[in-house]
Amino acid sequence: MAILSPRKTALALAVALSCAWQSPAFAHGGEAHMVPMDKTLQDFGADVQWDDYAQMFTLIKDGAYVKVKPGAKTAIVNGKTLELQVPVVMKDGKAWVSDTFINDVFQSGLDQTFQVEKRPHPLNSLSAAEISAAVAIVKAAADFKPNTRFTEISLREPDKKAVWDFALNGTPVNAPRAADVIMLDGKHVIEAVVDLQNKKVLSWTPIKDAHGMVLLDDFASVQNIINASSEFAEVLKKHGIDDPSKVITTPLTVGYFDGKDGLKQDARLLKVVSYLDVGDGNYWAHPIENLVAVVDLEQKKIIKIEEGPTIPVPMAARPYDGRDRVAPKIKPLDIIEPEGKNYTITGDMIHWQNWDFHLRMNSRVGPILSTVTYNDNGKKRQVMYEGSLGGMIVPYGDPDVGWYFKAYLDSGDYGMGTLTSPIVRGKDAPSNAVLLDETIADYTGTPTTIPRAIAIFERYAGPEYKHQEMGKPNVSTERRELVVRWISTVGNYDYIFDWVFHENGTIGIDAGATGIEAVKGVQAKTMHDPSAKEDTRYGTLIDHNIVGTTHQHIYNFRLDLDVDGENNTLVAMDPEVKPNTAGGPRTSTMQINQYTIDSEQKAAQKFDPGTIRLLSNITKENRMGNPVSYQIIPYAGGTHPVATGAKFAPDEWIYHRLSFMDKQLWVTRYHPTERFPEGKYPNRSIHDTGLGQYAKDDESLDNHDDVVWITTGTTHVARAEEWPIMPTEWAHALLKPWNFFDETPTLGEKKE
């Protein structure tokens, strides 16, 4: 039976009952209480579509796909007939349903997508009640101060071996639920560990020399500071702006330049670049160029205004929401699953085909997939303990006053989980997707539900295999994929992350960038203008008076692979041309040079797509005696030029602070506190506290519990086709079984 949210059901019915009426249609021997269909189902979270040709409603909610005609006594739910107690009734041109319609249809038992969790997984996200409890316990501590804000409240993970024992054998984890709490007391970062079961603070640790994340209320603070500044208002007049209320501010981290930017290292600062709202819905198209305000968040004031030559604000309207366009007419494309989903969701566990994995949301890195296993002919085999975005950076290459500091650590500085963008069915994800709400804590410590935070859907992905033998019947089968999709909007850019599970054991990781380019105002209208060459030194002229500045989107994924067990080894296979010594007319042969990469510093390397890198379990073999392995492919194609490394000189501070950018493969020994490639507190960090630090001690990787980190991404050279809104541009990575199985895994089980 489908388990649906009682809170949502109650809300939908409460709203609907306020405008209900009695119908002569009878249910259970009495008059039915009728409520408006559109309002009731939309408040419940379902999509309502009307097919004028078929004279039929289509209702979509998570795992249920319902078709029903007005007046009919039956509905079709996932391809199966369901008798209705009360038909849909049309009155005054509107559809009405009984107040039992939601329960009758969406809890009919025909949709088996959601199952009851009988044994809570030890990695389940903190519930709203647990978040509130953690905050109450922390606030009761003697050292807590009233104006303290919360950066992150998340599950403190139990011991890894105990979690695997639970996932593989069902052994309960003998540890109380606990929370990690990160706070900001003014500019001071504090970490606390809270025992939720025994309601006490286990540790309280001030963190020295750390700048915390930028929190959502910092955005409002900056806007208020700018609006209240008479000094800034005077500077705006140089740019032809007399009304400061039309100015939109974007608070940005200031980076680190060893004092060469004239900023105090211990101050909590943001740099503010601004845009003019001209009423077209796209203020990004109207940059106020060469104007930067430096705001001190503690003093609540502008401490410095940095200026360059005055550039007129580009004023041409550039809406991207379709207000000035005629929408193309396209016929509907319906994706239906008439017999229901091929996957089930039990609590936070997903089961599809032979895959099982746990899914939870983190306010910094978004979805975390855990205890990933593959059922190989009845044996549950370990593949990955945890996989998630580790971190990312978007560095720009322009040295001008409004650009030189721009290197956005989107997850580490802003929290990409917090900035999750609700997914729109039929646009951001296909109509057959299940959309999951997620709960995190806001900066006040209040539990906040993000609606439609994650989409899960199955899709057709071409042929899995095919062979047409001459004169024989065709042999082929379709490829299916299960996709876990999450979208985060960080300022002008929207990032789409897909975890793609293949039936054949492959896991794809796709990162897509869309949204609005960060653009620079310039003098040139066309490339024939006198200033065009200088104006486009660091970018492309993509509109009159607008340059798209060259930058990079660099993603790093933390992948704690446990290939058939926790102890693994990094193996290299390099195809080589070698002389033919076996005789015959050939002078050369293709051979594989295979060797072990046995330490962390040796493992940190550029990715050569002509070579093979494996994480192998040298203690396990397939039936041919080959060690079971997974291939690591940091870059498996994309639609922009690949980022082969950081486009910065080695003497740049950003290069020293964030070395994860420049190598596509890193492998480190497992340590539970090593989670972020940019380090735990990267904002204004003065040296590398991430992967460069993790690999510094050069620990052995040979037959140990190793963690793989892959860096991938693109160098973004702007083009006109990406303006005023950018089509999604993808970078793809893969984890692929390599002698992990004994044969083609999608052939199916052998007949008895």
From Swiss-Prot:
PROSITE patterns: COPPER_AMINE_OXID_1 (PS01164), COPPER_AMINE_OXID_2 (PS01165), PROKAR_LIPOPROTEIN (PS51257). Its main location: periplasm. Cu cation binds at H551, H553, H716. It comes from the Bacteria. Keywords: Catecholamine metabolism, Copper, Manganese, Metal-binding, Oxidoreductase, Periplasm, Signal, TPQ. The keyword Signal applies. One of its GO terms (cellular component) is periplasmic space. One of its GO terms (biological process) is catecholamine metabolic process. The keyword Amino-acid biosynthesis does not apply. InterPro entries: Cu_Am_Ox_Cu-bd, Cu_Am_ox_TPQ-bd, Cu_amine_oxidase, Cu_amine_oxidase-like_N, Cu_amine_oxidase_C, Cu_amine_oxidase_C_sf, Cu_amine_oxidase_N-reg, Cu_amine_oxidase_N2. Ca(2+) 2 binds at E600, Y694, D697, E699. The active site is at D410 (proton acceptor), Y493 (schiff-base intermediate with substrate). It holds the Pfam family Cu_amine_oxidN3. Gene3D superfamilies: 3.10.450.40, Copper amine oxidase, catalytic domain, Copper amine oxidase-like, N-terminal domain. Binds 1 copper ion per subunit. Binds 2 calcium ions per subunit. Ca(2+) 1 binds at D560, L561, D562, D705. Residues 1-27 form the signal peptide. Active on tyramine, tryptamine, beta-phenethylamine and dopamine. Homodimer. Belongs to the copper/topaquinone oxidase family. This is Primary amine oxidase. It comes from Klebsiella michiganensis (strain ATCC 8724 / DSM 4798 / JCM 20051 / NBRC 3318 / NRRL B-199 / KCTC 1686 / BUCSAV 143 / CCM 1901).
